[in-house]
A protein has these predicted regions:
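Leu/Val/Ala/Ile-rich N-terminal alpha-helices, chiefly Sec-type signal peptides and the beginnings
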Residues: 1-49
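Preference for long, well-ordered alpha-helical segments
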Residues: 101, 105-164
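Short, charged/polar, low-complexity loop and linker segments
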Residues: 74-87, 108-117
Length: 164
């Protein structure tokens, strides 16, 4: 499944989450997707972005691993369905938005948590989502100089004035 479509599924699932375990599960799913997208970009992207892409993959792994992994549910791990990144800049912008939404949802869960362990679990998940989002933003910041290569174009973009 294409990355933007998977991200959309994740955003809808997060919006429909009714309680803390559902939100934590969606945070975990988002981090697993960040890991998968970072890995794919590291393998297939331009060499100059591979270090940043690996950092995204590692940040996603930290946020989707550990002893506090929620039960994934009947749908399984969505990131395992990733078959292509598609339009890389759009996929990264959407992933960044998803990770931002996850952070906001986790803040709400943490503020309502009465159990200290659950509170700190939320705080760790917030930090992980923020770190992954920072990595996405860094890749996006550097991506425009590689945009033509990422879309398979080797000349001026259609409609640009530099072709004259």
């Amino acid at each position: 499944m294409e990355a933007v479509r998977l991200i959309g599924v994740g955003r809808r699932a997060l919006a429909q989450s009714q309680d803390a375990p559902d939100i934590m599960r969606e945070a975990w799913q988002a981090q697993a997707l960040a890991q998968a997208m970072g890995s794919r970009l590291a393998m297939l992207g331009p060499p100059e972005l591979r270090g940043d892409a690996l950092s995204l993959s590692e940040a996603g792994a930290r946020g989707s691993g550990g002893s506090a992994v929620p039960v994934v549910g009947a749908g399984g791990i969505r990131a395992a369905q990733l078959t292509e990144l598609g339009e890389v800049d759009r996929a990264l912008r959407e992933l960044g938005a998803l990770l931002g939404d996850v952070g906001i949802a986790l803040v709400a869960v943490a503020s309502e948590s009465f159990e200290e362990g659950a509170y700190w679990q939320c705080m760790e998940a917030i930090d992980a989502a923020d770190e992954s989002r920072d990595r996405v933003l860094e890749i996006l910041r550097r991506l425009p100089e590689h945009d033509d290569r990422m879309h398979g174009r080797h000349g001026p973009a259609p409609g640009s004035d530099s072709a004259a």
